[in-house]
A protein has these predicted regions:
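Catalytic/RNA-binding core of pseudouridine synthases
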Residues: 1-231
């Protein structure tokens, strides 16, 4: 890979580490590219944010390839998710402490599978209040952390499939394919509400964005060994 090719425009696949924001990952990529190729400036962007607590695929575009970002953002995504039932958190993930513990001794595997099927197709969900969505010019998570009352608007999204279901109470794991803009944290929360015992997202890994797979990230030019070796 040459400096000219990167400036002209390339698409790279990166496996984002846990507890990194997508913004931090992009900054790291810029730093590494500038250091490696002596760039003074380089345009770098990604096609779809991942929460800090999530790992997995970031599609990174450089140079003129950044024009492809909006097109890539529109394609379906796939995630591996783990949820914990019988308890909730304010953030719908592990960022906030557990609240509202509920007995789950009456919950069966068949009931969980039945509930998961209800979320196939077009659904309506509310994004978590701890999200990057802007409300009157401010990020929802900034308002929530400041103690402000935050009302999130419902949005429609599509769940294409939920498969490879593994149940080891209180944990439920599955692969989910979904449309652009789906919040898996909200899906976890809503599954818990439908079960009647609450739930939150304990692990999330993005495995695919359209035709791109996280399995390809380890062998492409911007490998994690190259990018994150100096963390």
């Amino acid at each position: 890979m040459t400096a000219e090719q990167i400036l002209e425009g390339q698409v790279f696949l990166v496996d984002k580490p846990f507890d990194w924001t997508s913004f931090q990952a992009i900054n790291k990529i810029k730093f590494k590219l500038k250091k490696e190729f002596k760039f003074k400036k380089i345009k770098v962007g990604h096609a779809g944010t991942l929460d800090p607590k999530a790992t997995g695929l970031l599609v990174v575009c450089t140079g003129r390839a950044t024009k492809k970002i909006s097109e890539i953002q529109d394609v379906p995504k796939e995630y591996w998710a783990e949820i914990k039932i019988g308890v909730q958190t304010e953030s719908y993930d592990t960022e906030k402490p557990e609240i509202f513990p509920t007995d789950i001794s009456h919950i069966t595997e068949d009931f969980v599978t039945e509930v998961l099927r209800k979320f196939l197709g077009e659904i309506t969900q509310k994004p978590p209040i701890f999200s990057a969505i802007k409300i009157d010019g401010e990020r929802a998570y900034d308002l929530a952390r400041a103690g402000a009352s935050v009302e999130m608007k419902s949005r429609k999204t599509t769940i294409h499939y939920i498969k490879d279901i593994q149940i080891e109470f209180p944990y439920v794991r599955f692969l989910v394919g979904c449309s652009k803009g789906t919040y898996i944290r909200s899906l976890a929360h809503d599954i818990g509400q439908e079960l009647g015992v609450g739930a939150y997202l304990t692990q999330l890994r993005r495995t695919k964005i359209g035709e791109y797979s996280v399995e390809e990230a380890s062998s492409n030019f911007l490998s994690n060994e190259f990018l994150f070796s100096e963390i």
